[in-house]
């Protein structure tokens, strides 16, 4: 049987990703220029593949860019979000395990982290964070990409897939308020937040006073 000449059900990369030239160009222009982006489209319409393709191109074009990817689809608690957020940041900005651990020690000072090594090469390192006062720890974690960007002289882009799923968390309002407060003050970090449920995404981003712009 001949192999099907396209990818389905997973992120299409390299020769499996074609076209969408204008979309890739726009994403690179906005995110590379420090403008936050929100994307909405149904599941399986290629948002994740588009973002990945555009960001991999941008990393080649702008050597100071580091891209961090987080999938929020299966996050079920505020603490889990912070753990996965920190893991995604460290994975995106540090090229080796030794550098990731050094970044943990240097940039996450109020938290006692432990390191979990997975066999999955895509998510090879996960960080488990032992929280002290949640408010202080949460703000430190959300500010992690900005602290690292300033210290290393880089531009960090954080891409969060299925962002609207976070609105289902029991403590969503607290999480949302903290994200808005912290992210508004960041100048070296840019966010690409994308999801498949239009009404939920519009509820999150639909007001002119939101803090994501």
Each model region followed by its residue ranges:
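Conserved nucleotide-binding/hydrolysis micro-motifs of P-loop NTPases
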Residues: 34, 73-77, 165, 196-201
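Conserved Walker B catalytic segment
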Residues: 127-198, 206-208
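Short glycine-/polar-rich loops that comprise or flank the Walker A/P-loop
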Residues: 63-67, 187-189, 213
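P-loop NTPase nucleotide-binding core
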Residues: 42-45, 49-157, 172
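Residue-level signal for alpha-helix termini/capping positions
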Residues: 31-32, 59, 150, 184
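Helix-loop-helix "sensor" segment of P-loop NTPases
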Residues: 203-213
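Walker A/P-loop-proximal flanking segment of P-loop NTPase domains
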Residues: 1-45, 49-58
């Amino acid at each position: 049987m001949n192999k099907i000449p396209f990818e389905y059900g997973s992120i299409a990369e390299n020769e499996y990703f074609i076209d969408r030239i204008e979309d890739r160009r726009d994403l690179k222009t906005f995110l590379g220029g420090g403008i936050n982006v929100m994307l909405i489209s149904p599941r399986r319409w290629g948002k994740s593949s588009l973002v990945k393709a555009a960001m991999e191109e941008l990393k080649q074009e702008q050597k100071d860019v580091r891209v961090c990817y987080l999938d929020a689809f299966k996050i079920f608690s505020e603490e889990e979000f912070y753990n996965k957020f920190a893991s995604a940041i460290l994975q995106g900005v540090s090229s080796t395990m030794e550098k990731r651990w050094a970044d943990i020690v240097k940039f996450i000072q109020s938290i006692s982290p432990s390191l979990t090594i997975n066999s999955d090469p895509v998510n090879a390192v996960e960080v488990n964070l032992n929280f002290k006062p949640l408010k202080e720890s949460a703000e430190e974690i959300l500010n992690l990409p900005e602290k690292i960007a300033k210290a290393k002289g880089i531009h960090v882009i954080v891409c969060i897939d299925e962002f609207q799923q976070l609105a289902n968390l029991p403590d969503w309002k607290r999480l949302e308020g903290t994200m808005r407060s912290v992210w508004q003050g960041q100048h070296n970090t840019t966010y690409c937040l994308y999801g498949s449920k239009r009404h939920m995404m519009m509820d999150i981003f639909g007001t002119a006073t939101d803090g994501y712009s």
